[in-house]
């Protein structure tokens, strides 16, 4: 369950900061 949340958080951060 945690890996899914971490993945979603990373995706959001990536989209906001444009740093992937």
Swiss-Prot record:
Disulfide bonds join 14-20. Expressed by the skin glands. GO terms for biological process: defense response to bacterium; defense response to fungus; killing of cells of another organism. InterPro entries: Antimicrobial_frog_1. Its main location: secreted. One of its GO terms (cellular component) is extracellular region. Keywords: Amphibian defense peptide, Antibiotic, Antimicrobial, Cytolysis, Disulfide bond, Fungicide, Hemolysis, Secreted. It is found in: Secreted. Coiled coil: none annotated. Antimicrobial peptide with activity against Gram-negative and Gram-positive bacteria (MIC=13 uM against E.coli, MIC=3 uM against S.aureus) and fungi (MIC=3 uM against C.albicans). Shows hemolytic activity on human erythrocytes (HC(50)=8 uM). Belongs to the frog skin active peptide (FSAP) family. Brevinin subfamily. This is Brevinin-1SPd. It comes from Lithobates septentrionalis (Mink frog).
